[in-house]
Regions:
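Asp-box/WD-like beta-propeller blade repeats and closely related beta-sheet repeat scaffolds
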Residues: 133-166
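Bacterial N-terminal signal peptides
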Residues: 10-19
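Residue-level detector of functionally pivotal "anchor" positions at catalytic/ligand-binding pockets or at interdomain
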Residues: 385-400
């Protein structure tokens, strides 16, 4: 009898795990996805009713630094699938408040972090082509296009901060010089920064910067592939491919690397849908982390939606990741837990928890909104053509 009871217990436990697993892979409705995105977004908009107010932490920073710029990428993605004027007005007020300039350094800055806000400036220009919205970020990038230096992106986060800007300008102005410079900067990061580049062609993942390429290893002897860093890269590739013409130079390089990265992410996804902060070492501060996971869900869902990732495993992984974020990280009031604070490696901001806020609450939300926007499409949601049209080339002002 005892043996029979044990078998029943095992069967019940197995059935429970199966039910949990199926729930994790159950596609939410488009309406539920929008609802969760709205709640998360409203939390930040309530906290920052004036989007131009500086961020005050250990020092005062303008509100168009990279952390907030990443949020606005997500907000514009939300606007695409849930076109409320409140979102558009909030973004325009932000851009106008910063005079449509980079965060620091004016048009002379080559720092990708300073330039990241330009992604949203350009998207707002594409909705309403007022020249002031694009002039300064274009002048900033034009200086880099006309320079012979290609080593500006020495950390992989930079790829997401700046690559889409070059791609957007190349598409708007139909000028391949932006695509060529984009490739030169990207390829230097991939193959030359550090000892042999920051990309491992065997594992199809990236070291965050030269401090983490071999011989550096995690405490358990593994390569340290930081989750959010790789999330930045996957997001960069998706956002570049999203606007690049099919015949743009070097497009195939980005497609190949995107697919290789996506394939590498599948076997290391956690059962709860998240990815560990150290992708190859679950013992190095292992646990749920929202920002990297959000970027991965965005990339995977985007790849499925655009026909680059055709195997069912990618769709399942995206659903599993999104459900993990919503079920385990999103609070009823819109706060997102398990967001790792700013940094460059798995140990930064540890330990993480459901209730612990990151030092900046904006970029994690940006990842969540980007992910949700593609999950909305994956779930069968329809996007209004008038909003989709902002990706279409408009009459451009003066060329490069």
């Amino acid at each position: 009898v005892g043996h029979s009871k044990f078998q029943c217990a095992v069967c019940f436990a197995g059935l429970l795990l199966l039910i949990i697993g199926l729930r994790a892979q159950e596609m939410p409705t488009p309406e539920k996805i929008i609802e969760d995105m709205r709640v998360a977004n409203q939390y930040l908009m309530n906290k920052w009713p004036d989007p131009t107010v500086p961020t005050v932490k250990d020092k005062v920073r303008p509100s168009n630094i990279w952390t907030r710029a990443a949020y606005y990428e997500g907000l514009m993605a939300l606007y695409r699938v849930d076109p409320q004027e409140t979102y558009y007005d909030y973004a325009v007020q932000w851009g106008e408040g910063h005079n449509w300039e980079p965060a620091y350094g004016g048009t002379r800055t080559t720092d990708a972090d300073n330039q990241c806000c330009g992604q949203t400036y350009i998207e707002l220009y594409q909705i309403d082509p007022k020249p002031e919205r694009i002039e300064k970020i274009k002048a900033t990038i034009d200086r880099m296009v006309n320079s012979d230096e290609n080593d500006a992106w020495s950390w992989i986060d930079a790829l997401q901060m700046a690559m889409p800007i070059f791609a957007k300008l190349g598409a708007i102005y139909q000028d391949n010089r932006y695509f060529e410079k984009l490739y030169s900067l990207y390829y230097f990061t991939k193959t030359q920064h550090g000892d042999n580049g920051l990309y491992n062609p065997e594992d199809h993942l990236w070291w965050r910067d030269k401090d983490f390429d071999p011989p550096y290893t995690s405490p358990n002897g593994e390569d340290t592939y930081w989750s959010r860093g790789n999330g930045w890269v996957l997001t960069a590739l998706a956002r570049v491919l999203d606007v690049m013409p099919e015949d743009a130079p070097h497009r195939e390089e980005y497609v190949t690397t995107f697919k290789d990265m996506a394939e590498a992410l599948i076997p290391i996804q956690r059962e709860d849908g998240f990815w560990n902060v150290s992708l190859h070492d679950p013992e190095e501060f292992g646990g749920k982390e929202t920002s990297g996971t959000g970027f991965f869900v965005f990339g995977l869902a985007w790849g499925v939606n655009h026909g680059l990732l055709t195997d069912e495993i990618y769709k399942i992984a995206a659903i599993k990741g999104w459900n993990g974020l919503v079920n385990d990280a999103l609070h009823e009031n819109g706060f997102l837990g398990y967001v790792q604070s700013t940094g460059k490696q798995p140990s930064d901001g540890q330990p993480l928890s459901y209730d612990k806020p990151a030092n900046f609450e904006d970029y994690g939300l940006g990842a969540f909104l980007l992910a949700g926007s593609e999950m909305f499409v994956l779930a069968g949601g329809s996007v209004q053509s008038s909003i989709e049209g902002r990706h279409i080339d408009l009459t451009a002002p003066e060329r490069l």
